[in-house]
Amino acid sequence: MAIFVNSRKQKFNIMKKLFLILLTCVTVLQAKAQISQAAYERWHQSKYSMFIHFGLYSELGGVWEGKPVTRGYSEQIQSFAGIFSDWYGDTALRFNPTQFNADEIVALAKEAGMKSIVITTKHHDGFCMFKTATTDYNSYDATPAKRDFVKELADACQSGGIRLGLYYSIIDWHFPQAYPISSHNCDFVTPQHQKFSKAQVTELLTNYGPISELWFDMGSNTPEQSKELYQLVHKLQPDCMVSGRLGNDQYDFSVMADNKYPEGVLQSAWQTAASMFDETWSYRSWQERGDVHVKTMEKLRSLINVVSHGGNFLLNIGPKGDGSVVPFEKEVLKGIGGWLKKYGYAIYGTEASPFRELFDWGTTTRKGTELNLILS
């Protein structure tokens, strides 16, 4: 898996490539000037993390009134199925995910070789998976479960020695002073909505221990609104990385479009977020899942592709409405974890391939003067 360079000509070529890498590093340092070097390195060197989409939509499982909703992501079923807010909200009355076990999820992430977990604290539907003083529309006050799932996962991550990140949707279809549901999810943010978001972000960064990243999503903030949220995050937790979807160049790392991958090395800190199936992020009861081995190899190649281009890979699971992890997704993660136990040295703590050309046989990663050849 490793080659060493000895000839003078090869050393000269490597030095040229390392000079280009140095320029890349300078650019990255400029992009992350708001956070410490140590915080950036912890995030950048982890390479591989778990994304969890879990909420009221998990209870519906991509089905409304007995019929599969085939349009759009299942976590946005309220929008794509045209469900009235009151009807959708009634889902909370039966949402009681007794099989959600934060310790087991942390154990699965560690077995999969993942270094952190990012969970949806609130998606576009506005339903909060944490106990909040800002609204009763949350998993503690509005459901028979009466549980703070973010707290449970935060505690499990702390005891399990794995970092926690939080997804937070700026779009909020439940907040009365927010723009109503739209087809593009890029609505402007009213002053009242901004105040509401800041209050929730303050809770999330105050009540749940160290947070490795805050994964903002959607909405069209003004430059001032983005700046306010970015500065709030770093005031409360200076080492918390902020995702590029906050907008207006207020970020610590950029995020590719859903399930998209760059063709080359990007000149900044970046991440690809990927779902098991492109059609949805949350649980879909009628999803055709196919062969476990085929899916495992697909996502493993995606991980290698991202890391060889200098990025981090955030791979999603969508627990069922009862809180259990779909067995298919569990087996995929375990399969990737098995490969990483053998060859993780070619992934963790590495830098992007110094080569700009693509190879038929696979790709490379770099650690110091050592090149790792990963055959595909």
Question: Which functions belong to the PLM regions below?
Answer:
Residues M1-Q34:
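Bacterial Sec-dependent N-terminal signal peptides
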Residues A33-S376:
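Mature catalytic domains of secreted/periplasmic carbohydrate-active enzymes
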